[in-house]
């Protein structure tokens, strides 16, 4: 494959954009090559500026559950543009999408739209602090909740990719209010709560950790968090920016039967456009301005383009058998890749929840950040480059999740499995 145009654009970009990209993981540093510059996408395929076409398992980092450029969503957004892109004023579309989200997600009685997942988690934490009158928050090592200062402490995702668990520029005063427990370890949570009795405002957790690969919750973990939070008057926040509407229509809380006090959501509720949301119990949400004293605002929050895309996306997700079909596709490709590795005698640990999956380059089970960090990232980087050469586009980091869309046909999945067999043999 020829990547010369992408290489030229990356050189040019570095003169005007820090690092040449607008989000660090896009730089491909951890996989030892220059990034691709994408020209267009449709269904499960993306095409770069050199004309190379790839089967896409990144899906804009999760939200493209329908595949790229779904005609029903694209048509609705094009029509919405003709009426205006942004008004900075209420629209009926906001109410429609809010009601759809409330009907879908068990924990959400009221919801506030924002423009990103980072905004959603940042605002949810501010609201939890306002509700409880407490300052400290508890998160988990390897879980990423956006790039706000309070949450860039032992984070996963991009921070894990670059080996920087804490970012320069985050004041110690912020960091000292953030407690960090081990994912899937209730004991570590109990210890921190006991040491900070009556001071913890909220526990924020990815119910399916998707920013250190794909790490499911162990049996009893989410239930244990729910019990602890109820006992201690702590707000339980599920960060479902990745898992919401992805692993089930009602998210991971539907799958595992555990209802948090608040939930954050991301771009999937806007069909991949810039959007996020946070919602929860009415008694908490009514503390938000203008009905309450906890301030949160955004000029583009609830903008008509994102709301339109979200409404059409959620309509399509309600189709009979949608998630059953998606589950079959996801199970098929994840199992096929695992078999390919086994056939080649290459040790991997395969994990999957719904249409989120990860091939960990480790012979041992992965259940938290400590075990994830033991993965052979150099071997993954080689695998990534080999798969790219075979026309398969994976996330450029061992610590990211792969996403299957409803647009992936059996022939796409078979081609992916065949590419994996060839790549594992070459390692």
Swiss-Prot record:
GO terms for molecular function: glutamate-1-semialdehyde 2,1-aminomutase activity; pyridoxal phosphate binding; transaminase activity. Its EC number is 5.4.3.8. It is an enzyme of class 5 (isomerase). Keywords: Cytoplasm, Isomerase, Porphyrin biosynthesis, Pyridoxal phosphate. It comes from the Bacteria. It catalyses: (S)-4-amino-5-oxopentanoate = 5-aminolevulinate. It is found in: Cytoplasm. The modification N6-(pyridoxal phosphate)lysine is found at residue 267. CDD domains: OAT_like. GO terms for biological process: protoporphyrinogen IX biosynthetic process. The keyword Transit peptide does not apply. Its cofactor is pyridoxal 5'-phosphate. Pathway: Porphyrin-containing compound metabolism; protoporphyrin-IX biosynthesis; 5-aminolevulinate from L-glutamyl-tRNA(Glu): step 2/2. GO terms for cellular component: cytoplasm. PANTHER family: GLUTAMATE-1-SEMIALDEHYDE 2,1-AMINOMUTASE, GLUTAMATE-1-SEMIALDEHYDE 2,1-AMINOMUTASE 1, CHLOROPLASTIC-RELATED. Homodimer. Belongs to the class-III pyridoxal-phosphate-dependent aminotransferase family. HemL subfamily. This is Glutamate-1-semialdehyde 2,1-aminomutase. It comes from Geotalea daltonii (strain DSM 22248 / JCM 15807 / FRC-32). The gene is hemL.
């Amino acid at each position: 494959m020829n990547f010369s145009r992408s290489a030229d654009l990356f050189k040019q970009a570095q003169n005007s954009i820090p690092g040449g990209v607008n989000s660090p993981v896009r730089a491909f540093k951890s996989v030892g090559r220059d990034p691709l510059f994408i020209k267009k996408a449709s269904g499960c395929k993306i095409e770069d500026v050199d004309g190379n076409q790839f089967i896409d398992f990144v899906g804009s980092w999760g939200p493209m559950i329908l595949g790229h450029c779904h005609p029903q969503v694209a048509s609705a957004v094009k029509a919405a543009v003709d009426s205006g892109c942004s008004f900075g004023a209420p629209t009926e579309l906001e109410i429609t999408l809010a009601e759809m989200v409330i009907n879908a997600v068990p924990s959400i009685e009221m919801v506030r739209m924002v423009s990103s997942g980072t905004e959603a988690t940042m605002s949810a934490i501010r609201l939890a602090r306002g509700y409880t009158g407490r300052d400290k928050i508890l998160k988990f090592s390897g879980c990423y909740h956006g790039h706000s200062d309070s949450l860039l402490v032992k984070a996963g995702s991009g921070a894990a990719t670059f080996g920087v668990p804490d970012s320069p520029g985050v004041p110690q005063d912020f960091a000292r209010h953030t407690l960090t427990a081990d994912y899937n370890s209730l004991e570590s949570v109990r210890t921190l709560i006991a040491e900070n009795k009556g001071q913890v405002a909220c526990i924020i957790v990815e119910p399916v950790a998707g920013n250190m690969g794909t790490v499911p919750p162990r049996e009893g973990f989410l239930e244990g968090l729910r019990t602890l939070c109820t006992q201690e008057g702590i707000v339980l926040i599920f960060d479902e920016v990745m898992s919401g509407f992805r692993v089930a229509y009602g998210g991971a809380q539907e799958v595992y039967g555990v209802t948090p006090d608040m939930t954050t959501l991301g771009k999937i509720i806007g069909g991949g456009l810039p959007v996020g949301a946070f919602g929860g119990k009415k008694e908490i949400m009514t503390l938000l301005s203008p009905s309450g004293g906890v301030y949160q605002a955004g000029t583009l929050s609830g903008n008509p383009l994102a709301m339109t895309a979200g409404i059409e996306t959620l309509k399509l997700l309600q189709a009979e058998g949608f998630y059953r079909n998606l589950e079959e596709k996801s199970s098929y490709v994840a199992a096929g890749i695992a078999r390919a590795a086994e056939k080649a005698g290459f040790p991997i640990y395969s994990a999957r929840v719904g249409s989120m999956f990860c091939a960990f380059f480790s012979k041992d089970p992965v259940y938290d950040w400590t075990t994830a960090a033991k993965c052979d990232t150099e071997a993954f980087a080689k695998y990534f480059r080999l798969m790219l050469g075979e026309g398969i586009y994976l996330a450029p980091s061992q610590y990211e999740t792969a996403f299957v869309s409803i647009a992936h046909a059996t022939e796409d999945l078979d081609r992916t499995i065949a590419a994996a067999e060839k790549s594992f043999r070459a390692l």
